[in-house]
Amino acid sequence: MTTPAGNTALKAARIAAGYPSQQALADALGVGVRQVRRWESDVPPWPQPEVAQALTRLLGQDLESLGFAPGRGPDRGRRAVLPPTAVGLATVPRQAANMQPATAAEDYCAVTCAHRRLYWSVAPATLHPAALSHAALGCALLSETAGQTRHRIAAALAETYLLAGRIEFFDLRDPGRAQDTFLRALQAASEADDALLGAAVLAHTAFVPGWSGDREAAAERMVAARTYARRGPASAELLAWLDAVEAECETRCGDTRAALRLIGHGEDVIASGGGHPSPEWLDWFSPVRLAAFKGNTQLRARHLPQARETLLGALEALGPEEAKQRSVVLGDLAAVEAADGNPEEACAYALLALDELERTWYATGMDRVREVRRVLAPHQHRACVRDLDDRLYGWGTTVSAIAR
């Protein structure tokens, strides 16, 4: 005598949505595990309306596709209404069709992590289209997944859009396009209900008005970012990074005193530590990066001895894989020496920055070198400045600047 297979449709949908056990689904729904066992039996009872809506939302399929027959309970309609998805992202399927297995989330997240690491070594113009293609895949997968599987893909999609937006803003110098991409990242973070990712995206959106001198708009976005950070287990580094972002916006809007106060607060936050670890995607910030922020702010505030000391400490602490940040710090050190009337030392640091840029291109680093060259205009007849020009406008640097 064969054992009844039970409601295999519900079981398959449960596993595909990332709930490997009946208990896991019961916990997600807020019902007892015995109820889930009854649903996965040969004759599953029709769920109550509120539970039915939650079940279809979690598993991404209507009740009939999940193996329930209307005749076994009150007629609740052929399909439970599913919540709308954020604008620009894929919608949840309303019937069983091409549902991906739970492993789809692991596979998609693996590529997202690879892109995160590649950002620090691959040319932006090469990585950017790959990130956008990966985002398009993530949007498609949202319509073919549900539950925890969909949740994980949405979070990885938010990170992918954030990476693409960072490339557009910091590397390709296209703030308008970056703003649109950050919006898509925020929508995906909403789908994942990931408050910390939302905080990170919102803080990045503050760079757009902040770098153009719109202090009010930048401040408003930072308030939103901090609000989202309070909703999750924010690490000390994430909170300090929010201080650093706001400090950079204040600096670019001309208030270096406020910026230094914010950086001081960030240093205190890191020193006090915290019980929450930083998320894996927060790989663009560390105490060393905070020191680099501080050195740049001291430079703009004309605190030259302090800026020199801070930047030299940051340069010494940077790891070998941090070529992009090294080019920025070297550029700032060159600016310190140029402002302090030391053109020879300024050119030496600028040449070191160009060495880093030849290995790993970074538009922000090149901007620092060009700013130094403008300051050195009164010394342009000196041999050190002519040597800098030969490197700055050499074939390799010029082609890299245009191609990337």
Where on the chain are the PLM-derived regions?
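A short, Lys/Arg-rich alpha-helix, primarily the initiator
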Residues: 1-20, 24, 53, 64
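Residues in the recognition helix of alpha-helical DNA-binding motifs
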Residues: 13, 28, 39, 69
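Recognition helix of helix-turn-helix/homeodomain-like DNA-binding domains
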Residues: 30-47
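Alpha-helix N-cap/N′ positions at the starts of helices
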Residues: 2-9, 31, 110, 160, ...
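Compositionally biased, long intrinsically disordered regions
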Residues: 57, 64-110
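DNA major-groove recognition helix of helix-turn-helix/homeodomain DNA-binding modules
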Residues: 30, 49-65
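Conserved binding/catalytic microenvironments
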Residues: 99-105, 109-404
